[in-house]
Amino acid sequence: MRKVLLTLTILLTSYATIFAQGIEIAFALPVGNYQLSDNTAKMLRSKFLPAMTESGVETAEVSTIAIKPEISFVNKQVVEGGMRNIHTSDIQFNFICTNLATNTTFASCVVTVRGEGFSDDDAIKNAISKLSAQDKRLTDFVNKAKDKIIDYYQHNLNSVISRARTFANIQQYGEGLALLFSCPATISGYTKVNNEITTIYRQYQTQECNNVIQKARTEFSNGNFDAAVEYLQQIDMTSSC
């Protein structure tokens, strides 16, 4: 939870720059019955990102909205070779654009490519190498996702803000901020999102400040004056407390 809040704190300090340019979408790690190697996962991400850029979508390392690729094998065969067997299969890539906080799905796209190699991972790599960022199926998918995201938040903005407030009221500030950060800056009424982000973050600041002060008081009452001072030095100077 603290890690989430730290990430959101960093985002908050620069959200005007980040979101002024439009929609940001992350590319999540692939999922499926087969565990990809790190290199193969990175290869798929690198192959797909140009399709997002081509469609005017900014990519992000961290975002509530993400494209989740699911990989499965169709018509899988293992052909005996000389020294090593050759794995061949139709590799099915199911790309899903979703809000990770609400599980709202905006768009999906299935692309099937033939792959082969000396292992399942090699077969997937071979299939990935055949993917093209200019593939109309991929660019149409990203464009559809972009339009659906804008439409969703435009029509559900008040509901999103209300849900964020509900999270804040039960002190789940990270979840509340994550919802608000997923709103594109291009929608009308985004000023309300900006204001709510500031309000919830200040609530979080106040809670953290009070917690630190309580710890400092405990250390002080126990005679641990240096420890008390160290706690007080952790207080955000912009906090209201």
Question: Which residues make up each language-model segment?
Answer:
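Bacterial Sec-dependent N-terminal signal peptides
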Residues: 1-24
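Intrinsically disordered, low-complexity boundary segments flanking structured domains
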Residues: 11-12, 54-59, 94-100, 198-199
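N-terminal segment of the mature soluble domain
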Residues: 21-70
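Charged, low-complexity, helix/coiled-coil-prone segments
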Residues: 34-40, 64-80, 118-125, 171-177
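Amphipathic beta-strand/beta-sheet edge segments enriched in Tyr/Trp
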Residues: 68-121
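C-terminal/domain-edge helix-coil "capping" segments
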Residues: 106-107, 111-237
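Short, intrinsically disordered, charge-balanced linker/junction segments flanking boundaries
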Residues: 240-241
